[in-house]
Amino acid sequence: MSNYFDKIEKVKYEGADSTNPFAFKHYNPNEVILGKTMAEHLRLAVCYWHTFCWTGNDMFGVGSLDRSWQKTGDLLEGAKQKAEIAFEFFQKLGIPYYCFHDVDIAPEGNSYKEYVHNFHTMVDILEKKQAETGVKLLWGTANCFTNPRYMSGASTNPNPEVFSWAASQVFNAMNATKRLGGENYVLWGGREGYETLLNTDLKREREQIGRFMQMVVEHKHKIGFNGTLLIEPKPQEPTKHQYDYDVATVYGFLKQFGLEKEIKVNIEANHATLAGHTFQHEIATAAALDIFGSIDANRGDPQLGWDTDQFPNSVEENTLVMYEILKAGGFTTGGFNFDAKIRRQSTDPYDLFHGHIGAIDVLALSLKRAAKMIEDKTLQGIVDQRYAGWNGDLGQQILAGKASLEDLAKIVESKALDPKPVSGQQEYLENLVNNYIYR
């Protein structure tokens, strides 16, 4: 195994009083909460792209990070070195899963033939590394947005040859995900949107992406992939407007093309921020629509209008997120993938550990606080009482379709209905939640 991170043996749980920066203060993977271990609840994953592929570049500057595997003249050899170091990191951090795009793990090459050769070579290596370490693949995906061929979209591109290239990448990436035991396959339409309506046929592009997703579902069943298909919503960036704007928009799209039973959502915190929603809102919406699948854990900056992909650090925010997840029954095939990157000035390789350790502890503490909310049932009891009238005769008749507008007008008149406003108790409920978080 690689020894790139030679200062660390393995990150372990030492408890809240520990001052060791390379120890977990709250994440005890074997601690049982609501009948499952923390590890089973959280299903943590490290992302390949931000962690091992990013150079530290931004819109105004070149890469600032010193990564040995990015300096090799032979790109495939660099990819092999990167895989060794990645699995060293996974093992020493002690997380069970990782995630990747196809071109994260292998150089794209200059032709389709080179792409396939490089990708298959690296899949062979990842398969061996998984067997050696026990680390598993949470999900795989294809990068159909970085190459200039995708500047006008992938499945929504005006050129069917570009559509075909995207299909070829998804074909290879899904096959690899199945081979590696991946539990999900993600589709993020990085450039599935538009810059201007002046050169865009919205109806045609919607039909194209709808057919593409149908083809993805068809291939899943053809190869016997038993994992979950996931779409990741995002409102904009890099395009001005993306078609998978938010969870509700994705659900409408799935319904239009008959895919609502086939595809769920992978929700990213920062994407919720960009869409003008809270992270909690997006998860609650997905659960209500029965399309909740997985999470990309990170945070955005409300003062900035772009995807900052910072590590989550708010127990207040994530307690409510965990509460929604627990109410929905928890993850099945999904989990918490850290789609987060260290800052451009964080040039020490061990900053990767600090970012992940802190984020994992935030999720662990949030899980414990949310579990208390579930166990006590106080909050849910207040919500149940608020809607109790719908369990009575009138409410049930309305929901069962046994009352028309005319029927209800007659009831209001005959019974002289005069309902009085009832307090929503928002301030009390906010105090109640804070009591769980801070006690």
Swiss-Prot record:
Its cofactor is Mg(2+). It is found in: Cytoplasm. It is an enzyme of class 5 (isomerase). GO terms for molecular function: magnesium ion binding; xylose isomerase activity. The active site is at residues 101, 104. It comes from the Bacteria. Mg(2+) 2 binds at residues 268, 271, 307, 309. Keywords: Carbohydrate metabolism, Cytoplasm, Isomerase, Magnesium, Metal-binding, Xylose metabolism. PROSITE patterns: XYLOSE_ISOMERASE. Its EC number is 5.3.1.5. Its main location: cytoplasm. GO terms for biological process: D-xylose metabolic process. Binds 2 magnesium ions per subunit. It catalyses: alpha-D-xylose = alpha-D-xylulofuranose. Homotetramer. NCBIfam families: PRK05474.1 (NF003998), xylose_isom_A (TIGR02630). Belongs to the xylose isomerase family. This is Xylose isomerase. It comes from Actinobacillus pleuropneumoniae serotype 5b (strain L20). The gene is xylA.
